[in-house]
Amino acid sequence: MKLINLTKHQVNLFTNGEIISIPPADCDPIRITTHQREISRVDGIPVMQTVYSQSEVTGGRLPDPKPNTMYIVSSLVCMAYSDRRDLVSPNTHPDATVRDGMGNLMGVTSLQSFYRRN
């Protein structure tokens, strides 16, 4: 399986005692525009719904799916395109991160998917 990093950051995967570094591809990173709208109030405090818009992608273009290829994108892009099985993002869940002594993120131990069958 080929991994192509469409983020602007190098992705470091800590797995099986080694570090796999995946540099960004030579393209503009893909960004998703978000919108918020108030859906209710709790004791006068607004409760906002965040909506991710596939129609308002900025930066680079999301490639079409290819056999044996996974694309690393931001979690927001991954969530907005939850119909795409070929999109993954670095798993930044606290149980999946590797940090240095100062708490800085060095990498992750896995990737995550937000794929949902429609």
Model-derived features: positions:
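Intrinsically disordered, low-complexity segments enriched in small/polar residues
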Residues: K2, L6-N118
